[in-house]
């Protein structure tokens, strides 16, 4: 059932060191404010902080009370206030208001602001404008890498996607470069580097500068990770927009996995309480089903339950000594496994109920038709029906974006019709969201008469191929064209299978989308790793309209062991999905690699749409 790791698979580095470093730095910063203090924490730092330093650790370092940073001012009686926050102007104003309120009341306190993952000049400017810069001390908690699992690191920066890919804000690029620099300092240099995307290129260039400045630190170190591959999210929007059908992806789509854990409600726990569950390799049941297609999961869990019952039944024929050994050595483990099994069976039942209600099969059929380029009229009618029935506005928006990207933009008539129907169904407040989606290249309108293609053809006759490529790229950039259909053919993203695709024994990465589609991002990674360069992929890169690069340091590669050369760090800027993670884990098992994932945040289609939306749910 579950795909086992190959016996010759390389060992993963120990990333627990990253947690220890982050915890030690936070404790050091807290101790700079000696004595009892109240700690104000920004909402989206609470879950990451809990994975690093729980309440008992904070209490050991004289944190008295914990408060959540909210819109309204919180009253605290402590003489020392510490703020653990993201570098946001809104939050700086909140702190400034609190300090100014104390000043008006004639109250003298000490204030310390800890900004994570880095301090921005704009934040200090706001404090200065509000007249409190001299009253507070500002520090930086460079916490940018959180190990969510043995092979998954997250920067926990979900805003990265909107900030860069919509607003063009480059402030997080330094954070990415610093994170890569930390990894190369702790785990040795990366002999082979590949990347695609503008954000990736900027992050790589800045990281190389940091490496050159402190080269002496990693010189002579044996590399622990042989390859690093950096990829921008806008290289492949299609994969992120598709419904997920591997178990971990479905759990994320249905219940929202947050910072590596999920809240299972009463419908899953079969009690009147919700339960927060950590989803990682330590959960033995979950680790066996996380990468599986959902159609296989129920059968596996049923068999697991029967095996577990058989182990319990062994007690009947035991003598006292055997029973004593059973209780001391096995019973605790069996009870834990039984608890986890019950939870995952409950989660599966809940997913099935929700998906049956949504007519999930019809939805998947429509998505597959869009990916393959068949029955586009029928698919458009399905989306219109979706909008008319006022199914989730996010879901309708996602399908419109998938139609747009796979068709290289909507024809003007369809664009106007779908947009009008959407605004009438869900409200005119969504108008700005359409503007955002257009700017990001997610939902676009084809140029009438395909004017750009005609101009490109004329240009290509007048200049050399190389220059024509550059000018064509410029036109493509203006039009935000996806070229998905052409890329799909070049990279064979739609497998041609005789008969039914066997999801129990998958033949390729397409199993993560029921055999209908190989994730574009994963196929690019596979092709580049096979070639050890971008050679032979020039046309694909041109169609993607992205910067690409490859760099090999032979001196470092010579020092690397054969095991480390089979370890590949994949960096997703703008977020990655659990489907992509499952697909690359499968590829690793097939080819003898082991993939490690670093992402700005784990994402899915709903989070992608919410990031673009101007209407907050």
Swiss-Prot record:
Belongs to the STXBP/unc-18/SEC1 family. Gene3D superfamilies: 1.25.40.850, 3.40.50.1910, 3.40.50.2060, Syntaxin Binding Protein 1, Chain A, domain 2. This is Vacuolar protein sorting-associated protein 33B. The lineage of its organism: Eukaryota, Metazoa, Chordata, Craniata, Vertebrata. Interacts with RAB11A and VIPAS39. Associates with adaptor protein complex 3 (AP-3), clathrin:AP-3 and clathrin:HGS complexes. It holds the Pfam family Sec1. PANTHER family: VESICLE PROTEIN SORTING-ASSOCIATED. It is a peripheral membrane protein. Keywords: Acetylation, Cytoplasmic vesicle, Endosome, Lysosome, Membrane, Phosphoprotein, Protein transport, Transport. It comes from Rattus norvegicus (Rat).
């Amino acid at each position: 059932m579950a795909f086992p790791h190959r016996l010759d698979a390389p060992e993963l580095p120990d990333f627990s060191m990253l947690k220890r470093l982050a915890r030690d730095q936070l404790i050091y910063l807290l101790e700079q404010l000696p004595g009892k203090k109240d700690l104000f924490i920004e909402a989206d730092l609470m879950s990451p902080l809990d994975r690093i330093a729980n309440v008992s650790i904070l209490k050991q370092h004289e944190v008295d009370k914990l408060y959540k940073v909210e819109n309204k001012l919180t009253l605290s009686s402590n003489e020392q206030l510490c703020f653990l926050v993201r570098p946001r102007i809104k939050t700086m104003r909140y702190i400034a208001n609190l300090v100014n309120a104390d000043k008006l009341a004639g109250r003298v306190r000490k204030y310390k602001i800890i900004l994570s993952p880095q301090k921005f000049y704009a934040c200090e400017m706001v404090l200065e404008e509000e007249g409190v810069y001299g009253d507070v001390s500002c520090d930086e908690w460079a916490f940018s890498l959180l190990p969510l699992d043995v092979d998954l690191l997250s920067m926990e920066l979900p805003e990265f996607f909107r900030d860069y890919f919509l607003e063009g804000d480059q402030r997080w690029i330094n954070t990415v470069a610093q994170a890569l620099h930390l990894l190369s300092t702790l785990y040795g240099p990366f002999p082979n580097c590949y990347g695609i995307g503008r954000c990736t290129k900027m992050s790589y260039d800045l990281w190389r500068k940091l490496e050159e400045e402190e080269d002496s630190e990693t010189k002579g170190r044996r590399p622990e990770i042989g390859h690093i591959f950096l990829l921008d999210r806008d290289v492949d929007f299609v994969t992120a927009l598709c419904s997920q059908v591997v178990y971990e992806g479905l759990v994320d789509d249905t219940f929202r996995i947050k910072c590596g854990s999920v809240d299972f409600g009463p419908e899953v726990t079969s009690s009147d309480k919700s339960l927060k569950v950590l989803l990682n390799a330590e959960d033995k049941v979950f680790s066996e089903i996380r990468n599986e297609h959902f159609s296989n999961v129920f059968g596996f869990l049923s068999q697991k339950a029967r095996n577990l019952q058989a182990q319990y039944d062994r007690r009947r024929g035991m003598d006292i000594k055997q029973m004593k050994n059973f209780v001391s050595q096995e019973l605790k483990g069996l009870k834990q496994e039984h608890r986890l099994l019950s939870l995952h069976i409950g989660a599966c039942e809940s997913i099935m109920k929700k998906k049956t209600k949504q007519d999930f099969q019809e939805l998947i059929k429509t998505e597959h038709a869009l990916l393959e380029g068949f029955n586009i009229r029928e698919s458009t009618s399905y989306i219109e029906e979706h909008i008319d029935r006022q199914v989730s506005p996010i879901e309708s928006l996602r399908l419109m974006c998938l139609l747009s990207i796979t068709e290289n933009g909507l024809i003007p008539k369809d664009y106007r019709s779908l947009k009008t129907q959407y605004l009438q169904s869900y409200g005119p407040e969504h108008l700005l969201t359409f503007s955002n989606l257009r700017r990001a290249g997610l939902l676009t309108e084809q140029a009438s008469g395909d004017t750009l293609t005609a101009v490109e053809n004329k240009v290509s006759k007048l200049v050399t191929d190389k220059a024509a490529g550059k000018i064509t790229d410029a036109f493509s950039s203006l039009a935000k064209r996806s070229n998905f259909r052409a890329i799909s053919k070049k990279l064979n993203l739609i497998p041609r299978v005789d008969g039914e695709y066997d999801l129990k024994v998958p033949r390729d990465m397409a199993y993560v989308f029921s055999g209908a589609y190989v994730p574009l991002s994963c196929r690019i990674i596979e092709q580049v790793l096979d070639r050890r360069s971008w050679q032979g992929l020039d046309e694909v890169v041109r169609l993607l309209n992205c910067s690409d690069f490859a760099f090999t340091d032979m001196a470092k590669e010579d020092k690397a062991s054969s095991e480390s050369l089979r370890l590949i760090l994949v960096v997703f800027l703008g977020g990655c999905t659990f489907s992509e993670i499952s697909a690359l884990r499968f590829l690793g098992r097939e080819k003898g690699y082991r993939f490690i994932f670093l992402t700005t945040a784990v994402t899915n289609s709903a989070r992608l749409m919410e990031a673009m939306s101007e209407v907050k749910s």
